[in-house]
Amino acid sequence: SLMQKKYTDFKLGVPDYVTVETEDERLVCQGGQLIVTAGATTVEFQDAGEHEDIFVTSEDAVRCVKLRWNYKIPKSARFLGDAWERTYGDVEWHGMSGNRYLPWYFLAKLSEKVLCFGVKVRPSAMCCWQADTKGITLFLDVRCGNTGVQLKGRKLRAAQIVCMEAEGADTFETAQEFCKKMCTDPIFPEFPVYGSNNWYYAYGDSSEEEIL
């Protein structure tokens, strides 16, 4: 008999290690608590119900915050990641590779279930994940251009983490469901929208008649 589809949210909780990289230094701190202070930088974790908020505040120029969880995923799992901008037909399920960057979110397919890890849309950082045999890592790149962000004591909500486990659903259905959790306010027009990718719009001779 077909297993009933079951989607369950879960929380990663506070990370086991927090690394803060500023313009001047790189500090690795023990995690396991809601507030971690590294030099003049504070990283704060809040359970916000359906997601977990990560806040960063600092008097230093912060380049990146790295969060590490000792959350082990079996080496036999298959992984599907996203792309920074858009996919170019190169997204695929692949084996575990600890040095592969997985932008925004990823799915891990185990024998009986699929695990999903991601951040909600519109974060205040460029976010990517890594997964290896000993745990998973989330990178929060908060640079302004190529230099550390000058928060000057302001509190930045860098990202909102969401996690989901799926049983009895295929991977495509699971990805659809997880994308709904990452974007809870999509804008869907009531009519089809067609577009074209015209690299020459700025200096070419384009017209409505020519394109259509």
Regions found by a protein language model. Name each.
Residues S1-L212:
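Carbohydrate-recognition beta-sandwich/jelly-roll modules
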